[in-house]
Protein backbone atom coordinates (compact mmCIF):
# COMPACT_ATOMS: atom_id res chain seq x y z
CA UNK A 1 0.00 0.00 0.00
CA UNK A 2 1.25 3.44 -0.82
CA UNK A 3 1.38 5.96 2.01
CA UNK A 4 3.11 9.31 2.31
CA UNK A 5 6.20 7.50 3.63
CA UNK A 6 6.14 4.56 1.26
CA UNK A 7 6.60 5.71 -2.31
CA UNK A 8 7.30 2.30 -3.82
CA UNK A 9 4.16 2.44 -5.97
CA UNK A 10 5.01 4.88 -8.75
CA UNK A 11 1.95 6.61 -10.13
CA UNK A 12 3.52 8.37 -13.09
CA UNK A 13 2.86 11.99 -12.17
CA UNK A 14 -0.05 11.12 -9.92
CA UNK A 15 1.73 10.98 -6.55
CA UNK A 16 1.88 13.69 -3.92
CA UNK A 17 5.44 14.77 -4.72
CA UNK A 18 4.74 15.63 -8.36
CA UNK A 19 1.18 16.98 -8.08
CA UNK A 20 1.03 18.49 -4.59
CA UNK A 21 -2.13 16.47 -3.92
CA UNK A 22 -2.50 13.23 -1.95
CA UNK A 23 -4.56 10.32 -3.30
CA UNK A 24 -7.70 11.42 -1.47
CA UNK A 25 -7.74 14.74 -3.33
CA UNK A 26 -9.14 12.76 -6.24
CA UNK A 27 -9.09 14.37 -9.65
CA UNK A 28 -6.93 17.30 -8.51
CA UNK A 29 -3.95 14.97 -9.13
CA UNK A 30 -5.07 14.62 -12.75
CA UNK A 31 -5.39 18.33 -13.55
CA UNK A 32 -2.69 18.20 -16.21
CA UNK A 33 -3.17 14.58 -17.31
CA UNK A 34 -5.98 14.92 -19.84
CA UNK A 35 -6.10 11.20 -20.65
CA UNK A 36 -6.42 10.10 -17.03
CA UNK A 37 -8.90 12.89 -16.26
CA UNK A 38 -10.99 11.64 -19.18
CA UNK A 39 -10.94 8.18 -17.59
CA UNK A 40 -12.10 9.60 -14.26
CA UNK A 41 -14.97 11.48 -15.90
CA UNK A 42 -16.11 8.57 -18.07
CA UNK A 43 -15.99 6.24 -15.05
CA UNK A 44 -17.99 8.77 -13.05
CA UNK A 45 -20.58 8.93 -15.84
CA UNK A 46 -20.68 5.13 -15.71
CA UNK A 47 -21.44 5.20 -11.98
CA UNK A 48 -24.21 7.75 -12.52
CA UNK A 49 -25.82 5.76 -15.33
CA UNK A 50 -25.38 2.51 -13.35
CA UNK A 51 -27.27 4.07 -10.44
CA UNK A 52 -30.02 5.20 -12.81
CA UNK A 53 -30.39 1.75 -14.35
CA UNK A 54 -30.13 -0.22 -11.11
CA UNK A 55 -32.48 2.08 -9.20
CA UNK A 56 -34.89 2.05 -12.15
CA UNK A 57 -35.03 -1.78 -12.11
CA UNK A 58 -35.28 -1.76 -8.30
CA UNK A 59 -38.34 0.51 -8.52
CA UNK A 60 -39.89 -1.66 -11.26
CA UNK A 61 -39.35 -4.78 -9.15
CA UNK A 62 -41.03 -3.21 -6.13
CA UNK A 63 -43.80 -1.39 -8.01
CA UNK A 64 -47.40 -2.21 -7.07
CA UNK A 65 -49.74 -1.00 -9.86
CA UNK A 66 -52.72 -0.78 -7.49
CA UNK A 67 -51.10 1.94 -5.37
CA UNK A 68 -50.16 5.45 -6.48
CA UNK A 69 -46.48 5.95 -7.28
CA UNK A 70 -46.08 8.61 -4.60
CA UNK A 71 -47.14 6.11 -1.92
CA UNK A 72 -44.29 3.77 -2.86
CA UNK A 73 -41.29 6.06 -2.43
CA UNK A 74 -40.55 6.11 -6.16
CA UNK A 75 -38.52 8.93 -7.71
CA UNK A 76 -37.53 7.52 -11.13
CA UNK A 77 -40.76 5.93 -12.37
CA UNK A 78 -42.65 9.23 -11.88
CA UNK A 79 -40.22 10.86 -14.32
CA UNK A 80 -40.77 8.11 -16.90
CA UNK A 81 -44.54 8.29 -16.41
CA UNK A 82 -44.48 12.07 -16.86
CA UNK A 83 -42.83 11.47 -20.24
CA UNK A 84 -45.90 9.47 -21.23
CA UNK A 85 -44.46 5.96 -20.98
CA UNK A 86 -46.64 3.20 -19.60
CA UNK A 87 -49.54 5.36 -18.41
CA UNK A 88 -53.09 6.07 -19.53
CA UNK A 89 -56.02 8.27 -18.46
CA UNK A 90 -55.81 9.60 -14.91
CA UNK A 91 -52.16 8.62 -14.67
CA UNK A 92 -53.02 4.94 -14.27
CA UNK A 93 -50.07 2.67 -15.06
CA UNK A 94 -51.14 0.27 -17.83
CA UNK A 95 -47.74 -1.17 -18.84
CA UNK A 96 -44.52 -1.44 -16.83
CA UNK A 97 -42.46 -2.87 -19.71
CA UNK A 98 -41.18 0.56 -20.88
CA UNK A 99 -39.81 1.11 -17.36
CA UNK A 100 -38.00 -2.24 -17.52
CA UNK A 101 -36.55 -1.31 -20.93
CA UNK A 102 -35.32 2.03 -19.54
CA UNK A 103 -33.57 0.28 -16.66
CA UNK A 104 -31.87 -2.27 -18.92
CA UNK A 105 -30.76 0.40 -21.42
CA UNK A 106 -29.14 2.41 -18.64
CA UNK A 107 -27.51 -0.68 -17.17
CA UNK A 108 -26.01 -1.70 -20.53
CA UNK A 109 -24.87 1.88 -21.20
CA UNK A 110 -23.19 2.00 -17.80
CA UNK A 111 -21.17 -1.11 -18.68
CA UNK A 112 -19.86 0.59 -21.82
CA UNK A 113 -19.01 3.75 -19.86
CA UNK A 114 -17.43 1.71 -17.08
CA UNK A 115 -15.19 -0.11 -19.55
CA UNK A 116 -14.21 3.21 -21.16
CA UNK A 117 -13.47 4.73 -17.77
CA UNK A 118 -11.25 1.85 -16.69
CA UNK A 119 -9.52 1.80 -20.08
CA UNK A 120 -8.65 5.50 -20.01
CA UNK A 121 -7.76 5.47 -16.30
CA UNK A 122 -5.38 2.49 -16.54
CA UNK A 123 -4.41 1.73 -20.16
CA UNK A 124 -4.98 4.75 -22.40
CA UNK A 125 -2.47 7.59 -22.89
CA UNK A 126 -1.82 9.82 -19.86
CA UNK A 127 -2.25 12.91 -22.01
CA UNK A 128 -4.29 13.24 -25.19
CA UNK A 129 -2.45 16.21 -26.71
CA UNK A 130 0.19 14.15 -28.57
CA UNK A 131 -1.86 11.23 -29.89
CA UNK A 132 -5.31 12.82 -30.27
CA UNK A 133 -4.84 16.58 -30.63
CA UNK A 134 -8.56 17.14 -31.32
CA UNK A 135 -9.39 15.82 -27.85
CA UNK A 136 -6.32 17.31 -26.16
CA UNK A 137 -6.36 20.67 -24.42
CA UNK A 138 -4.43 23.03 -22.17
CA UNK A 139 -6.49 24.79 -19.51
CA UNK A 140 -5.02 28.19 -20.43
CA UNK A 141 -5.92 27.79 -24.14
CA UNK A 142 -8.89 30.16 -24.22
CA UNK A 143 -9.93 29.30 -27.78
CA UNK A 144 -9.92 25.56 -27.06
CA UNK A 145 -11.87 26.07 -23.83
CA UNK A 146 -14.67 27.97 -25.60
CA UNK A 147 -14.72 25.25 -28.28
CA UNK A 148 -15.30 22.65 -25.55
CA UNK A 149 -17.96 24.93 -24.05
CA UNK A 150 -19.62 25.11 -27.48
CA UNK A 151 -19.70 21.32 -27.84
CA UNK A 152 -21.32 21.01 -24.41
CA UNK A 153 -23.95 23.64 -25.31
CA UNK A 154 -24.83 21.81 -28.53
CA UNK A 155 -25.30 18.56 -26.58
CA UNK A 156 -27.56 20.35 -24.07
CA UNK A 157 -29.57 21.84 -26.93
CA UNK A 158 -29.95 18.41 -28.51
CA UNK A 159 -31.23 17.11 -25.16
CA UNK A 160 -33.85 19.87 -25.02
CA UNK A 161 -35.00 18.95 -28.53
CA UNK A 162 -35.32 15.28 -27.54
CA UNK A 163 -38.08 16.32 -25.13
CA UNK A 164 -39.70 18.40 -27.90
CA UNK A 165 -39.63 15.43 -30.30
CA UNK A 166 -41.09 13.09 -27.65
CA UNK A 167 -43.89 15.57 -26.92
CA UNK A 168 -44.79 16.46 -30.50
CA UNK A 169 -44.07 13.32 -32.55
CA UNK A 170 -43.29 10.25 -30.44
CA UNK A 171 -46.41 9.51 -28.42
CA UNK A 172 -46.71 12.75 -26.48
CA UNK A 173 -46.26 13.33 -22.75
CA UNK A 174 -48.55 13.13 -19.73
CA UNK A 175 -50.70 16.24 -19.32
CA UNK A 176 -52.24 16.54 -15.87
CA UNK A 177 -54.60 19.22 -17.25
CA UNK A 178 -56.20 16.98 -19.91
CA UNK A 179 -60.01 16.97 -19.40
CA UNK A 180 -61.40 14.38 -17.01
CA UNK A 181 -58.32 14.07 -14.83
CA UNK A 182 -55.19 13.90 -16.98
CA UNK A 183 -54.02 11.83 -19.95
CA UNK A 184 -51.12 11.32 -22.37
CA UNK A 185 -51.38 13.61 -25.38
CA UNK A 186 -49.26 15.05 -28.14
CA UNK A 187 -48.40 18.73 -27.64
CA UNK A 188 -49.13 20.23 -31.05
CA UNK A 189 -49.90 23.90 -30.45
CA UNK A 190 -46.52 24.98 -29.00
CA UNK A 191 -46.11 28.42 -27.45
CA UNK A 192 -43.28 30.09 -29.36
CA UNK A 193 -44.05 33.72 -28.50
CA UNK A 194 -40.89 35.22 -26.96
CA UNK A 195 -42.94 37.75 -24.99
CA UNK A 196 -44.78 34.94 -23.20
CA UNK A 197 -41.80 32.62 -22.69
CA UNK A 198 -39.23 35.23 -21.69
CA UNK A 199 -41.92 36.96 -19.64
CA UNK A 200 -41.55 34.12 -17.14
CA UNK A 201 -37.91 35.11 -16.62
CA UNK A 202 -38.93 38.70 -15.86
CA UNK A 203 -41.51 37.70 -13.23
CA UNK A 204 -40.83 38.18 -9.54
CA UNK A 205 -39.74 34.95 -7.80
CA UNK A 206 -42.03 35.70 -4.85
CA UNK A 207 -45.65 34.98 -4.03
CA UNK A 208 -48.15 34.40 -6.79
CA UNK A 209 -45.66 35.51 -9.46
CA UNK A 210 -43.33 32.56 -9.04
CA UNK A 211 -40.76 33.29 -11.82
CA UNK A 212 -40.43 30.33 -14.26
CA UNK A 213 -41.85 27.99 -11.63
CA UNK A 214 -45.30 29.49 -12.29
CA UNK A 215 -45.56 27.79 -15.71
CA UNK A 216 -48.87 25.90 -15.74
CA UNK A 217 -49.29 24.40 -19.21
CA UNK A 218 -47.31 22.01 -21.40
CA UNK A 219 -47.52 24.25 -24.46
CA UNK A 220 -45.32 26.80 -22.68
CA UNK A 221 -42.98 24.14 -21.26
CA UNK A 222 -42.35 22.40 -24.59
CA UNK A 223 -42.25 25.69 -26.51
CA UNK A 224 -39.69 26.90 -23.98
CA UNK A 225 -37.58 23.84 -24.77
CA UNK A 226 -37.68 24.77 -28.47
CA UNK A 227 -36.27 28.19 -27.60
CA UNK A 228 -33.75 26.86 -25.09
CA UNK A 229 -32.60 24.12 -27.46
CA UNK A 230 -32.16 26.66 -30.26
CA UNK A 231 -30.29 29.13 -28.04
CA UNK A 232 -27.97 26.38 -26.76
CA UNK A 233 -27.22 25.05 -30.25
CA UNK A 234 -26.63 28.48 -31.82
CA UNK A 235 -24.62 29.53 -28.77
CA UNK A 236 -22.57 26.36 -29.09
CA UNK A 237 -21.82 27.02 -32.77
CA UNK A 238 -20.91 30.61 -31.87
CA UNK A 239 -18.47 29.50 -29.18
CA UNK A 240 -16.86 26.92 -31.48
CA UNK A 241 -16.34 29.41 -34.30
CA UNK A 242 -15.19 32.43 -32.27
CA UNK A 243 -12.43 33.27 -29.83
CA UNK A 244 -13.16 35.08 -26.54
CA UNK A 245 -13.29 38.87 -26.82
CA UNK A 246 -10.78 40.98 -24.90
CA UNK A 247 -13.27 41.88 -22.15
CA UNK A 248 -13.99 38.17 -21.59
CA UNK A 249 -10.29 37.29 -21.54
CA UNK A 250 -9.78 39.94 -18.85
CA UNK A 251 -12.92 39.17 -16.83
CA UNK A 252 -12.49 35.43 -16.30
CA UNK A 253 -9.87 33.29 -14.63
CA UNK A 254 -8.69 30.71 -17.19
CA UNK A 255 -7.69 27.60 -15.25
CA UNK A 256 -9.08 24.13 -14.61
CA UNK A 257 -10.11 25.00 -11.08
CA UNK A 258 -11.84 28.17 -12.27
CA UNK A 259 -13.91 26.16 -14.77
CA UNK A 260 -14.77 23.74 -11.97
CA UNK A 261 -16.02 26.63 -9.85
CA UNK A 262 -18.12 28.05 -12.72
CA UNK A 263 -19.69 24.63 -13.27
CA UNK A 264 -20.45 24.15 -9.57
CA UNK A 265 -22.06 27.60 -9.45
CA UNK A 266 -24.30 26.75 -12.41
CA UNK A 267 -25.26 23.38 -10.93
CA UNK A 268 -26.07 25.10 -7.64
CA UNK A 269 -28.58 27.35 -9.41
CA UNK A 270 -30.03 24.27 -11.17
CA UNK A 271 -30.40 22.53 -7.81
CA UNK A 272 -32.19 25.42 -6.11
CA UNK A 273 -34.47 25.90 -9.13
CA UNK A 274 -35.30 22.17 -9.29
CA UNK A 275 -36.09 22.25 -5.56
CA UNK A 276 -38.69 24.98 -6.04
CA UNK A 277 -40.03 23.40 -9.23
CA UNK A 278 -40.75 19.99 -7.71
CA UNK A 279 -42.16 21.53 -4.54
CA UNK A 280 -44.60 24.01 -6.11
CA UNK A 281 -45.23 22.99 -9.73
CA UNK A 282 -47.89 20.35 -10.44
CA UNK A 283 -47.70 20.63 -14.25
CA UNK A 284 -44.08 19.63 -14.88
CA UNK A 285 -44.35 17.32 -11.85
CA UNK A 286 -47.92 15.94 -12.01
CA UNK A 287 -49.51 15.19 -8.65
CA UNK A 288 -50.75 11.83 -9.97
CA UNK A 289 -47.14 10.60 -9.82
CA UNK A 290 -45.36 12.84 -7.30
CA UNK A 291 -48.22 13.36 -4.87
CA UNK A 292 -49.92 16.71 -4.20
CA UNK A 293 -48.05 19.91 -3.47
CA UNK A 294 -48.39 21.32 0.05
CA UNK A 295 -50.97 23.95 -0.96
CA UNK A 296 -52.79 21.32 -3.04
CA UNK A 297 -53.17 18.92 -0.10
CA UNK A 298 -54.43 21.75 2.10
CA UNK A 299 -57.01 22.92 -0.45
CA UNK A 300 -57.99 19.29 -1.07
CA UNK A 301 -58.86 18.89 2.60
CA UNK A 302 -61.06 21.99 2.57
CA UNK A 303 -62.77 20.69 -0.58
CA UNK A 304 -63.28 17.20 0.88
CA UNK A 305 -65.05 18.50 3.99
CA UNK A 306 -67.07 20.98 1.95
CA UNK A 307 -68.35 18.02 -0.12
CA UNK A 308 -69.10 15.97 3.00
CA UNK A 309 -70.91 18.70 4.92
CA UNK A 310 -72.85 19.86 1.86
CA UNK A 311 -74.20 16.29 1.56
CA UNK A 312 -75.17 16.46 5.24
CA UNK A 313 -77.20 19.60 4.57
CA UNK A 314 -74.79 22.43 5.41
CA UNK A 315 -75.27 25.71 3.58
CA UNK A 316 -71.73 26.08 2.24
CA UNK A 317 -72.31 29.63 1.03
CA UNK A 318 -73.37 31.13 4.36
CA UNK A 319 -71.98 28.93 7.17
CA UNK A 320 -69.72 30.84 9.55
CA UNK A 321 -66.53 29.45 11.03
CA UNK A 322 -65.20 30.03 14.56
CA UNK A 323 -63.53 33.32 13.55
CA UNK A 324 -66.61 34.85 11.98
CA UNK A 325 -65.22 34.30 8.50
CA UNK A 326 -66.87 31.82 6.15
CA UNK A 327 -66.48 28.23 7.31
CA UNK A 328 -66.31 26.71 3.82
CA UNK A 329 -66.06 29.71 1.50
CA UNK A 330 -64.86 33.29 1.93
CA UNK A 331 -63.51 36.12 -0.17
CA UNK A 332 -59.86 36.74 -0.98
CA UNK A 333 -58.39 40.24 -0.56
CA UNK A 334 -59.18 40.89 -4.22
CA UNK A 335 -62.74 39.63 -4.06
CA UNK A 336 -62.55 36.09 -5.44
CA UNK A 337 -64.52 33.36 -3.69
CA UNK A 338 -61.98 31.01 -2.06
CA UNK A 339 -61.98 28.14 0.43
CA UNK A 340 -62.35 29.26 4.04
CA UNK A 341 -60.39 28.15 7.06
CA UNK A 342 -56.65 27.92 7.47
CA UNK A 343 -56.21 26.95 3.82
CA UNK A 344 -57.05 30.56 2.86
CA UNK A 345 -53.29 31.15 2.73
CA UNK A 346 -53.17 28.86 -0.33
CA UNK A 347 -56.08 30.54 -2.11
CA UNK A 348 -54.11 31.01 -5.35
CA UNK A 349 -53.49 27.27 -5.83
CA UNK A 350 -54.33 25.98 -9.30
CA UNK A 351 -54.92 22.26 -9.70
CA UNK A 352 -56.63 20.20 -12.43
CA UNK A 353 -59.22 18.68 -10.07
CA UNK A 354 -60.32 22.12 -8.83
CA UNK A 355 -60.21 24.47 -11.84
CA UNK A 356 -63.46 23.13 -13.45
CA UNK A 357 -65.34 24.45 -10.41
CA UNK A 358 -64.17 28.04 -10.85
CA UNK A 359 -66.09 30.84 -12.49
CA UNK A 360 -65.06 34.35 -13.52
CA UNK A 361 -64.81 35.39 -9.86
CA UNK A 362 -63.17 32.51 -8.06
CA UNK A 363 -65.01 29.36 -6.99
CA UNK A 364 -68.52 29.17 -8.46
CA UNK A 365 -71.19 28.45 -5.85
CA UNK A 366 -73.56 26.90 -8.40
CA UNK A 367 -70.84 24.57 -9.71
CA UNK A 368 -69.92 23.55 -6.16
CA UNK A 369 -73.59 22.69 -5.55
CA UNK A 370 -74.27 20.84 -8.81
CA UNK A 371 -71.16 19.98 -10.84
CA UNK A 372 -68.72 18.16 -8.54
CA UNK A 373 -67.68 14.90 -10.25
CA UNK A 374 -66.82 11.66 -8.42
CA UNK A 375 -63.22 11.72 -9.74
CA UNK A 376 -62.72 15.16 -8.18
CA UNK A 377 -63.95 13.89 -4.80
CA UNK A 378 -61.77 10.78 -4.98
CA UNK A 379 -58.68 12.67 -5.99
CA UNK A 380 -59.02 15.40 -3.36
CA UNK A 381 -59.61 12.82 -0.61
CA UNK A 382 -56.47 10.98 -1.76
CA UNK A 383 -54.42 14.19 -1.87
CA UNK A 384 -55.73 15.36 1.51
CA UNK A 385 -54.22 12.29 3.16
CA UNK A 386 -50.90 12.46 1.30
CA UNK A 387 -49.61 15.95 2.05
CA UNK A 388 -45.85 16.40 1.49
CA UNK A 389 -45.45 17.51 5.10
CA UNK A 390 -43.75 16.64 8.31
CA UNK A 391 -44.07 19.66 10.51
CA UNK A 392 -44.03 20.39 14.23
CA UNK A 393 -46.42 23.30 13.92
CA UNK A 394 -49.30 24.44 11.75
CA UNK A 395 -49.45 22.84 8.31
CA UNK A 396 -52.10 24.89 6.57
CA UNK A 397 -54.95 23.12 8.33
CA UNK A 398 -54.07 19.66 6.99
CA UNK A 399 -54.88 16.88 9.44
CA UNK A 400 -51.51 15.14 9.77
CA UNK A 401 -51.89 11.68 11.26
CA UNK A 402 -48.80 10.57 13.16
CA UNK A 403 -50.02 6.98 13.41
CA UNK A 404 -50.67 6.70 9.68
CA UNK A 405 -48.79 4.71 7.04
CA UNK A 406 -45.07 5.47 6.87
CA UNK A 407 -45.34 8.00 4.07
CA UNK A 408 -42.83 10.52 2.81
CA UNK A 409 -43.82 12.31 -0.37
CA UNK A 410 -41.44 12.13 -3.36
CA UNK A 411 -41.86 15.91 -3.48
CA UNK A 412 -40.33 16.10 0.00
CA UNK A 413 -37.46 13.79 -0.99
CA UNK A 414 -36.70 15.56 -4.26
CA UNK A 415 -37.10 19.12 -2.97
CA UNK A 416 -35.00 18.49 0.14
CA UNK A 417 -32.24 16.59 -1.65
CA UNK A 418 -31.95 19.20 -4.39
CA UNK A 419 -31.87 22.04 -1.88
CA UNK A 420 -29.12 20.35 0.15
CA UNK A 421 -27.12 19.42 -2.96
CA UNK A 422 -27.60 22.91 -4.38
CA UNK A 423 -26.26 24.37 -1.14
CA UNK A 424 -23.23 22.04 -1.07
CA UNK A 425 -22.47 22.83 -4.69
CA UNK A 426 -22.68 26.55 -3.89
CA UNK A 427 -20.15 26.10 -1.07
CA UNK A 428 -17.96 24.13 -3.48
CA UNK A 429 -18.29 26.96 -5.97
CA UNK A 430 -17.07 29.50 -3.40
CA UNK A 431 -14.23 27.21 -2.29
CA UNK A 432 -12.87 26.49 -5.76
CA UNK A 433 -13.43 30.05 -6.96
CA UNK A 434 -11.38 31.32 -4.02
CA UNK A 435 -8.57 28.87 -4.75
CA UNK A 436 -8.61 29.63 -8.48
CA UNK A 437 -8.53 33.39 -7.90
CA UNK A 438 -5.73 33.02 -5.35
CA UNK A 439 -3.68 30.96 -7.77
CA UNK A 440 -4.29 33.45 -10.59
CA UNK A 441 -3.26 36.32 -8.32
CA UNK A 442 -0.06 34.45 -7.56
CA UNK A 443 -0.27 33.89 -3.82
CA UNK A 444 -0.22 30.59 -1.93
CA UNK A 445 -3.42 28.56 -1.93
CA UNK A 446 -4.51 26.06 0.67
CA UNK A 447 -2.73 25.15 3.91
CA UNK A 448 1.01 24.82 4.43
CA UNK A 449 1.70 21.10 4.11
CA UNK A 450 4.93 21.34 6.15
CA UNK A 451 2.94 21.70 9.36
CA UNK A 452 0.12 19.34 8.44
CA UNK A 453 -0.51 17.06 11.48
CA UNK A 454 -0.79 13.90 9.39
CA UNK A 455 2.86 14.21 8.34
CA UNK A 456 4.03 13.54 11.91
CA UNK A 457 1.79 10.53 12.45
CA UNK A 458 2.91 6.89 12.23
CA UNK A 459 2.03 5.20 8.91
CA UNK A 460 -1.14 3.09 9.03
CA UNK A 461 0.70 -0.11 8.16
From Swiss-Prot:
Its job: One of the components of the core complex of photosystem II (PSII). It binds chlorophyll and helps catalyze the primary light-induced photochemical processes of PSII. PSII is a light-driven water:plastoquinone oxidoreductase, using light energy to abstract electrons from H(2)O, generating O(2) and a proton gradient subsequently used for ATP formation.
Residues that make up the propeptide removed upon maturation: 1-2
N-acetylthreonine: residues bearing it: 3
Cell location: Plastid, Chloroplast thylakoid membrane
One GO CC annotation: chloroplast thylakoid membrane
Family recorded in the similarity comment: Belongs to the PsbB/PsbC family. PsbC subfamily.
InterPro entries reported in the protein's UniProt record: PS_antenna-like, PS_II_antenna-like_sf, PSII_PsbC, PSII_PsbC_sf
Quaternary data: PSII is composed of 1 copy each of membrane proteins PsbA, PsbB, PsbC, PsbD, PsbE, PsbF, PsbH, PsbI, PsbJ, PsbK, PsbL, PsbM, PsbT, PsbX, PsbY, PsbZ, Psb30/Ycf12, at least 3 peripheral proteins of the oxygen-evolving complex and a large number of cofactors. It forms dimeric complexes.
S-S bonds: none
UniProt main location, coarse: plastid
Protein name, per record: Photosystem II CP43 reaction center protein
A single MF term (Gene Ontology): metal ion binding
Record-annotated membrane-spanning stretches: 57-81, 122-143, 166-188, 243-263, 279-300, 435-459
Bilayer topology annotation: Multi-pass membrane protein
GO biological process: photosynthetic electron transport in photosystem II
Cofactor remark from the record: Binds multiple chlorophylls and provides some of the ligands for the Ca-4Mn-5O cluster of the oxygen-evolving complex. It may also provide a ligand for a Cl- that is required for oxygen evolution. PSII binds additional chlorophylls, carotenoids and specific lipids.
Binding, [CaMn4O5] cluster: 355
Family annotation (NCBIfam families): psbC
Keyword terms, alphabetized: Acetylation, Chlorophyll, Chloroplast, Chromophore, Manganese, Membrane, Metal-binding, Phosphoprotein, Photosynthesis, Photosystem II, Plastid, Thylakoid, Transmembrane, Transmembrane helix
Phosphothreonine modified-residue sites: 3
Tree of life domain: Eukaryota
Pfam families recorded: PSII (PF00421)
SUPFAM superfamilies (UniProt xref): Photosystem II antenna protein-like
